[in-house]
Amino acid sequence: MVYMISYDLHSPTKNREEVEKDIESFGTWCKYLTTTYLISTSSSLETVTDKCVSHLDGNDAMIIAKVEKPIKGWLSQKQWDWIKRYL
């Protein structure tokens, strides 16, 4: 399963390392934008969400969505290679 995770922390440096550590702990990932990742994991959406939101507070935001083909965008070749491999 591939999920897109995008987040916005009210205080940009607050908990960023913890949030990114949790996202990256799911194994295979690619960071696309400053606060947007794609991850490839066998974990459920609920498991990913529960772990990733643990460092957020009421002023922060996060969305996690399942990603399926087709997919379009403006990315580097390295990012497209990741998508082709895992999606």
Named regions from a protein language model:
Residues 1-28, 38-43:
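Extended, hydrophobic alpha-helical segments
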Residues 13, 46, 73:
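Loop/helix-junction capping segments adjacent to catalytic residues or to phosphate/diphosphate-binding pockets
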Residues 18-24, 49-56:
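Short amphipathic alpha-helices in soluble, non-transmembrane regions
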Residues 25, 30, 73-75:
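Short linear sequence motifs
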Residues 32-35:
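Short Gly/Ser/Thr- and Asp/Glu-enriched loop/turn motifs at secondary-structure junctions
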Residues 53-87:
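C-terminal structural segments of small proteins and small subunits
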